[in-house]
Structures are given as structure tokens and as C-alpha cells.
């Protein structure tokens, strides 16, 4: 019978690598520590009743390689051996997976732990620098990603090891500072009476901010889709959309600067996800870095910390693969998150 196991021993190859999102699940198989991962087509979560069916039909039925173990990144709390996902109906059941899919070992980690693992050694071709700070230090880092929500993960460098730190940093407070902020914030939709960063810095938050700007300016909002708002903003074809994305970049800079100080992220702050990639032109305007650096009495420190947008199309899978190849380089906690036959 499979059971929880806190072993830090390497996962046995071949290893199934999975990044499970709300809409899509991405999989690859790593046959050994020196091989390139074998990628599989994205799986739409809505097309399968369970993750086990998705793995069987989307991966195992398409290859002769039988994984002995799996490492999965999921959006959701990992508290026991039934792990409900935040943004889709799947439930990850490692014991069932071991019995039904013929595996020996399953490790489940937080989705932004995987993103944090990825930024340990991201090449220049997989990141876009924002601002003038260029110092590339082997030092602690932080990644934040506006998407369905606002994910945050730290990557602490200590004793020659990279230690990913998951958390709920997307729910820190975000408050007004400028006169325009004080006009807009009363119209931001709150959660239980407060404005957290995630109420603005995600897809639905972008719409929330746009609607608040429209209310303040006395105009009728015409857009309900974040993609429409960003497209009109980048094209300069809608005044409210332009201001929405400009303020989004400002607020993202404020939160990113706060997190840089929390983690003393001299190794850099990384922005991940589709929204960050799409609004790179807006992030390269002065507002993001001005807000990022405006942290008196530590402005001089923030000016030295580089900021990047992650452009790797499969960053989470790359991070998990790095860990699977060389687990000794990372301080990944397995307590309560690893099951073995």
C-alpha cells in the first residue's frame, strides 16, 4: 500500500513532470538526469473527469516509456492525500495514482514553487529585462505572476542550495498612495472588506480596475475581458484601458518592490505568466520601475535589483525538471507531500 513518505532521496527515473493549471495541464517525461524532457501536447482539464484519466490518455497512451515516479505542481493547498485544485474540478489523489498508473513515487508541490525553481538558472533568452539594473548575482530571488490569481514564490539561496518558499503573498494588502489612487480605490471590488493585491493584479483584477476607472470618470465600461483591455491599452485606442494597464504596472511595481525587500532578492525579481508577457511594452515604460524603486529609505538598494519577465513557454516544467535531475541543489520540503509505494 502507498503511504506518505518524507524521504529526500531522488525520485526514480523515468519521471513524469506535470504543471497543472486551471485550464491546461502540461506534461513531460524525463528519462534520466541527462536527457532532454519529452514534451506532450497540452491537455485541457475540462476534457477529462480526473487527472488520472488525463495522464493515461494524454501521456501514457502516447509513449512506450512507463514513468516510475511523478512530480506535479498544482494550484491549491497540499494538506493530505486528496488535493483539490483551486481553478478546476480535478482532485489529485497520489495513492490512487500510484495504484492505478503503475508508479512507485509521487511528489506534489505548489505551482509557484515550480516557478521559483525555474528562476534559479534562467538563461537570457528565456527572460526579458525590465529597467536598467543588470547585476546578476547568485542570491535570493522572488517570482510573482498575475494570472487567474496572483501567485508568489520566493527562492532563498543559502548554504549553496536553492530553497523555494511557497506562500500566499498574492493576498497582501494593496492600498492607495496618489490622489488618483484615492479616487479609484473606493470603487475597487473588495474581498471581505479589504483590497488585497490579487483584487487588482490578476485577470479579473484588471477588469476590476478598469471598471473602477470608468466609474470615476463617469463613462460606461465597454470591456469585460482582460485580453480586450490589454489589447486596447497597448494600441492606445481606449483612454480608460491605457490608464488601467499603466496603473496595473504601477501597482505591480509596488508589490514587486515590497517582495524584493521581504526576501532581500538581490538576485532579481521575476514576473511570470501570460499577462506579464503580454504587457511587456507597458512594463518597459517608467512607471513599473519608478514604483518598484520608490521604497524610502531603501531606494538605493531597490535600484540595484534587476527585474525580468519570464518568457520561457514552459517555465514550471523546466523548474521541476531541474529539481528532478539534481535534487541535492535544492532544498525542497517533501514532508506531507510525497507518497511512495
Curated annotation (Swiss-Prot):
Organism from which the protein derives: Rhizobium johnstonii (strain DSM 114642 / LMG 32736 / 3841)
EC top class, as a word: transferase
Catalysed reaction equations from the record: D-glucose + ATP = D-glucose 6-phosphate + ADP + H(+)
Keywords carried by this UniProt record: ATP-binding, Cytoplasm, Glycolysis, Kinase, Nucleotide-binding, Transferase
Single GO MF annotation: ATP binding
GO biological process: glycolytic process
Primary subcellular site in the record, as a coarse category: cytoplasm
Gene coding for it: glk
Protein name: Glucokinase
Subcellular localization(s) per the UniProt record: Cytoplasm
Family the UniProt entry places it in: Belongs to the bacterial glucokinase family.
The keyword ATP-binding is annotated on this UniProt entry: yes
Amino acid at each position: 500500500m502507498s503511504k506518505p513518505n518524507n524521504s529526500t532521496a531522488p525520485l526514480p527515473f523515468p519521471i513524469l513532470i506535470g504543471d497543472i493549471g486551471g485550464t491546461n495541464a502540461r506534461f513531460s517525461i524525463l528519462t534520466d538526469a541527462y536527457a532532454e524532457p519529452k514534451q506532450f501536447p497540452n491537455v485541457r482539464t475540462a476534457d477529462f473527469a480526473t487527472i488520472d484519466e488525463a495522464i493515461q490518455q494524454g501521456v501514457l497512451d502516447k509513449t512506450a516509456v512507463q514513468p516510475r515516479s511523478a512530480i506535479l505542481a498544482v494550484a491549491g493547498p497540499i494538506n493530505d492525500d486528496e488535493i483539490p485544485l483551486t481553478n478546476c474540478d480535478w482532485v489529485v489523489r497520489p495513492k490512487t495514482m500510484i495504484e492505478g498508473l503503475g508508479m512507485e513515487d509521487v511528489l506534489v508541490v505548489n505551482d509557484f514553487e515550480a516557478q521559483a525553481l525555474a528562476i534559479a538558472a534562467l538563461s537570457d533568452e528565456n527572460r526579458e529585462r525590465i529597467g536598467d539594473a543588470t547585476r546578476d548575482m547568485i542570491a535570493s530571488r522572488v517570482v510573482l505572476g498575475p494570472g487567474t490569481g496572483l501567485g508568489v514564490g520566493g527562492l532563498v539561496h543559502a548554504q549553496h542550495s536553492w530553497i523555494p518558499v511557497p506562500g500566499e503573498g498574492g493576498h497582501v494588502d494593496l492600498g492607495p498612495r496618489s490622489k488618483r489612487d484615492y479616487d479609484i480605490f473606493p470603487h475597487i471590488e473588495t474581498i471581505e472588506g479589504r483590497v488585497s493585491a490579487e483584487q487588482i493584479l490578476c485577470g479579473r483584477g484588471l477588469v476590476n480596475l478598469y471598471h473602477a476607472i470608468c466609474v470615476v470618470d463617469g463613462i460606461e465600461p465597454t470591456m469585460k475581458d482582460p485580453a480586450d483591455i490589454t489589447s486596447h491599452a497597448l494600441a492606445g485606442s481606449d483612454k480608460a484601458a491605457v490608464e488601467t494597464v499603466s496603473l496595473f504596472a504601477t501597482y505591480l511595481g509596488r508589490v514587486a518592490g515590497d517582495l524584493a525587500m521581504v526576501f532581500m532578492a538581490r538576485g532579481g525579481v521575476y514576473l511570470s505568466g501570460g499577462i506579464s508577457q503580454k504587457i511587456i511594452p507597458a512594463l518597459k515604460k517608467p512607471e513599473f520601475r519608478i514604483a518598484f524603486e520608490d521604497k524610502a529609505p531603501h531606494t538605493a538598494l531597490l535600484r540595484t535589483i534587476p527585474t525580468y519577465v519570464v518568457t520561457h513557454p514552459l517555465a514550471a516544467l523546466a523548474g521541476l525538471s531541474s529539481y528532478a535531475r539534481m535534487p541535492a541543489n535544492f532544498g525542497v520540503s517533501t514532508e506531507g507531500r510525497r507518497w511512495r509505494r
